[in-house]
Amino acid sequence: MADDLDFETGDAGASATFPMQCSALRKNGFVVLKGRPCKIVEMSTSKTGKHGHAKVHLVGIDIFTGKKYEDICPSTHNMDVPNIKRNDFQLIGIQDGYLSLLQDSGEVREDLRLPEGDLGKEIEQKYDCGEEILITVLSAMTEEAAVAIKAMAK
């Protein structure tokens, strides 16, 4: 019975987001804006008006696409904050635009797409030169993407 439970993944059925009061959010923190996980790049608060609450104006950049999103909410309301995980995997191959990554468990993942743009070119270039590199993978709200690379410690 206990053999079919998987505790390795670490989320244990946890929600992809958790609530946080608007006034507790901070710049460089994370928040869900328009259904997308974003990093807060700008935040301003307006004073309490004649009717209602103080408002918080949030500007965030999507952590996967880089698109800019804005939202305004009362400071007392709750906003969703994405659960974000960063993992480093060793790059062992690139095939058909997908990365082959070695996990800590020894298993190989081949479901992550090579990022587009400069990062993708840099990964290919270092791989072609035979450098051993680690790929930093960011995962939030059922999405995953390679966001950074670093040389492996010898």
UniProtKB/Swiss-Prot annotation:
GO terms for biological process: cellular response to virus; positive regulation of intrinsic apoptotic signaling pathway by p53 class mediator; positive regulation of transcription by RNA polymerase II; positive regulation of translational elongation; positive regulation of translational termination; translational elongation; tumor necrosis factor-mediated signaling pathway. Changing V81G: Leads to temperature sensitivity when expressed in yeast cells. PROSITE patterns: IF5A_HYPUSINE (PS00302). Residues 20-90 are annotated as: Interaction with DOHH. It is a peripheral membrane protein. InterPro entries: IF5A-like, IF5A-like_N, NA-bd_OB-fold, Rib_uL2_dom2, Trans_elong_IF5A_hypusine_site, Transl_elong_IF5A_C, Translation_prot_SH3-like_sf. Mature eIF5A-1 may be used as an in situ diagnostic marker for aberrant proliferation in intraepithelial neoplasia of the vulva. SMART domains: eIF-5a. It is found in: Cytoplasm; Nucleus; Endoplasmic reticulum membrane. The keyword Magnesium does not apply. Its main location: cytoplasm. Acetylated by PCAF/KAT2B, regulating its subcellular localization. Deacetylated by SIRT2. Lys-50 undergoes hypusination, a unique post-translational modification that consists in the addition of a butylamino group from spermidine to lysine side chain, leading to the formation of the unusual amino acid hypusine. eIF-5As are the only known proteins to undergo this modification, which is essential for their function. Changing G106R: In FABAS; in yeast, exhibits reduced ribosome binding and cells show impaired synthesis of proteins containing poly-proline tracts. The keyword Nucleus applies. The modification N-acetylalanine is found at A2. Translation factor that promotes translation elongation and termination, particularly upon ribosome stalling at specific amino acid sequence contexts. Binds between the exit (E) and peptidyl (P) site of the ribosome and promotes rescue of stalled ribosome: specifically required for efficient translation of polyproline-containing peptides as well as other motifs that stall the ribosome. Acts as a ribosome quality control (RQC) cofactor by joining the RQC complex to facilitate peptidyl transfer during CAT tailing step. NCBIfam families: eIF_5A (TIGR00037). It is linked to Faundes-Banka syndrome: An autosomal dominant disorder characterized by variable combinations of developmental delay, microcephaly, micrognathia and dysmorphic features. This is Eukaryotic translation initiation factor 5A-1. It comes from Homo sapiens.
